Every structure is written in structure tokens, then in C-alpha cells.
Curated annotation (Swiss-Prot):
It is found in: Lytic vacuole. PANTHER family: CYSTEINE PROTEASE FAMILY C1-RELATED. Probable thiol protease. One of its GO terms (cellular component) is lytic vacuole. Transmembrane segments: none annotated. This is Probable cysteine protease RD19B. The gene is RD19B. Induction: By wilting and abscisic acid (ABA). Induced by drought stress. It comes from Arabidopsis thaliana (Mouse-ear cress). CDD domains: Peptidase_C1A. Residues 25-131 form a propeptide. Glycans are attached at N250. Belongs to the peptidase C1 family. InterPro entries: Papain-like_cys_pep_sf, Pept_asp_AS, Pept_cys_AS, Pept_his_AS, Peptidase_C1A, Peptidase_C1A_C, Peptidase_C1A_papain-like, Prot_inhib_I29.
Length: 361
């Protein structure tokens, strides 16, 4: 029996795929690196048990257990393919490894709608780009709240919206306040002017620009602690206007130009961004720079910075990257963050970028 091992190391536990050939049939195992000197090779069933324990997975029946096990094995194969297509990142087992692609899209993504601007949106003015720094990160400047978790609710758009307004409010007032996604989930039903019937609809998806339009019309957002997140929709709107703490003065869409995106990021704070999340289901860390990735947008995230030292296997050189704040909790990715290559609009990351300004009072 021949074992072909490919080991990927990270600071914490990571997962490495091992392809084993037995009588001409290929099976997929995973090596879990617990100790670099004493690695233990586990069968996929044993690893599924560890996966359930690590992420607190409980299934209601033996049938559900075996169904999820089959999905888990399929996702191991998918993660292997992602590793080959995206070698500068690390792909493997995540909390989403027992979900089908359709379940993942429905429960953890949620951007929908077209690209026509709401009536109160503008095209962002062209900014000078001659002296942009090589690296920039709003996390080091106090404009980014801790990573949040949308749960099994397609409300990513609301987290992207609040993240951008949290940063803008910080720039306007010097105060970092965590804002309420649940207010958007419950109260925002603004519609995309390009696509009839495509409206912000809680856990069933929405669009950041529509949410900015709602926030502008409503007067602003409450604190998260005053209107806490539940990860469910269908409830009544509990907006208390006397508790609004952050308001939008204007918002605009940035052109598909990475220097302009960087300039707007530096001047205006974290930016609301849409992306294709195909590679994010299996992402563990590193700089994601896939050879091929659709630009069909399906996930709302927050652009908080960029770096200059991510190695790209495709380009065989250091490649600059965007730093993305996600809304799947700190156990996903690099403590809740995602790095993706700059330079080619990979996964559509440059296609729909919005900046918002907050009022000073």
C-alpha cells in the first residue's frame, strides 16, 4: 500500500489530505497534525467523529448521521480539489463540512439583487492614488468590531452593512459601537430598483446598498446590545428610534479599480463588499488566489485592509491581498478573517464595493 502524504501546517490544528490506493480504488483519509513529531493518520469515519465533537454536531437519527457522513466525505474530496486549484491557501475541514453546497448557500450566504444603484446612492468620486501605502489595516486603527456570527441565517448582507457603518461612525465620532444586524433582518424590506421583487428579506438574503438606503430613510441603526441578534427572521420590527446611535449621511459605489478601492478604504473606512464564496466553505487560512473562480456574487463581507506579502503559487511571486472580515465566527478561517489576492478581481471581490459616510451627531 502506497501512502502519498501532503502535509499543511498552521499554528493551530489543521487538516491534511492523504490519498491511499487500495486495489486500484482511491480512498481519502485525513491526517490531523496534533503533534509534529507524532502525527496520527485517521480514517475518514474516525475523523468525522472528531469533526462532530469539535464543532458540536448532533444529528437527530442514525439515518441523518450516515447522510451527513456521506456529505462530509464528498466535501473532503471537494477540499482536495480546492487545494489543487488554490495552492497558496490552506483548505480542509471546517464547520461547514457536513453541508451540501445548496445548504451552505442557503444558510450562510445571502447576497441577492442586481447592480443598479438605489436612488440615494452615487458613484464614488475619483481619489488620488499616487501615495498609497503598501499595507493598511483598519483593525490596527480601532475601526473594526470583533468578528460576529450570522449562524444558519442568510443575513451576511446585514453584517456587511453594519460593519461598514461601524467603521464610518468611528471615523466620524471616534467611538466604535457594535450595531444591530437584527434591526436590518426584522425591519429592512428595501427593494433593489433593478430587479422587481428582489427585496431585503432577513435570513433569505438582501443587498448592502438596499440596506444603506433603508438606514438612510429610517434614520440609522441601534446598538447591537439594544437590539440583539437572534439569527432568525419573521419577527416584528422592534425599532426604537430614540435608541438610534449611528446614522448614514450618504453612501456610494466604488469603481472596479483596485487603486480606487484602496484609496476609498483608507479615506472612508471599511468597505461593504460582495464576493463569490465558493472557496470559502473549505478555507482554513493563507492567501486565497484560485486559478479559476466565478464572479457571480453571493456573499456579503467587509473589506478592512490589504497586505503585500502573500505568496501566489499561480504567479510564483509575492502577491498583494485584500483582508476580509467575515461573519461566520472566529473559529472559521484566520480568526474569522479571509485573505484573497488583489490584482484580477478574483471571485468578483472588486465588482460591488460600497462606501458609507456617517453623521457626526
Amino acid at each position: 500500500m502506497d501512502y502519498h502524504l501532503r502535509v499543511l501546517f498552521s499554528v493551530s490544528l489543521i487538516f491534511v489530505f492523504v490519498s491511499v490506493s487500495v486495489c486500484g480504488d482511491e480512498d481519502v483519509l485525513i491526517r490531523q497534525v496534533v503533534d509534529e513529531t507524532e502525527p496520527k493518520v485517521l480514517s475518514s469515519e474516525d475523523h468525522f467523529t472528531l469533526f462532530k465533537k469539535k464543532f458540536g454536531k448532533v444529528y437527530g437519527s442514525i439515518e441523518e448521521h450516515y447522510y451527513r457522513f456521506s456529505v462530509f466525505k464528498a466535501n473532503l474530496l471537494r477540499a482536495m480539489r480546492h487545494q489543487k486549484m488554490d495552492p497558496s491557501a490552506r483548505h480542509g475541514v471546517t464547520q461547514f463540512s457536513d453541508l451540501t453546497r445548496s445548504e451552505f448557500r442557503r444558510k450562510h450566504l445571502g447576497v441577492k439583487g442586481g447592480f443598479k444603484l438605489p436612488k440615494d446612492a452615487n458613484q464614488a468620486p475619483i481619489l488620488p492614488t499616487q501615495n498609497l501605502p503598501e499595507e493598511f489595516d483598519w483593525r490596527d486603527r480601532g475601526a473594526v468590531t470583533p468578528v460576529k456570527n450570522q449562524g444558519s441565517c442568510g443575513s451576511c448582507w446585514s453584517f456587511s452593512t453594519t460593519g461598514a457603518l461601524e467603521g464610518a461612525h468611528f471615523l466620524a465620532t471616534g467611538k466604535l459601537v457594535s450595531l444591530s444586524e437584527q434591526q436590518l433582518v426584522d425591519c429592512d424590506h428595501e427593494c433593489d430598483p433593478e430587479e422587481e421583487g428582489s427585496c431585503d428579506s432577513g435570513c433569505n438574503g438582501g443587498l448592502m446598498n438596499s440596506a444603506f438606503e433603508y438606514t438612510l430613510k429610517t434614520g440609522g441603526l441601534m446598538r447591537e446590545k439594544d437590539y440583539p441578534y437572534t439569527g432568525t427572521d419573521g419577527g416584528s420590527c422592534k425599532l426604537d428610534r430614540s435608541k438610534i446611535v449611528a446614522s448614514v449621511s450618504n453612501f456610494s459605489v466604488v469603481s472596479i479599480n483596485e487603486d480606487q478601492i484602496a484609496a476609498n478604504l483608507i479615506k472612508n473606512g471599511p468597505l461593504a463588499v460582495a464576493i463569490n464564496a465558493a472557496y470559502m466553505q473549505t478555507y482554513i487560512g493563507g492567501v486565497s488566489c484560485p486559478y479559476i473562480c466565478s464572479r457571480r456574487l453571493n456573499h456579503g463581507v467587509l473589506l478592512v485592509g490589504y497586505g503585500s506579502a502573500g505568496f501566489s503559487q499561480a504567479r510564483l511571486k509575492e502577491k498583494p491581498y485584500w483582508i476580509i472580515k467575515n461573519s461566520w465566527g472566529e473559529s472559521w478561517g484566520e480568526n474569522g478573517f479571509y485573505k484573497i489576492c488583489k490584482g484580477r478581481n478574483i471571485c468578483g471581490v472588486d465588482s460591488l464595493v460600497s462606501t458609507v459616510a456617517a453623521t457626526t451627531s
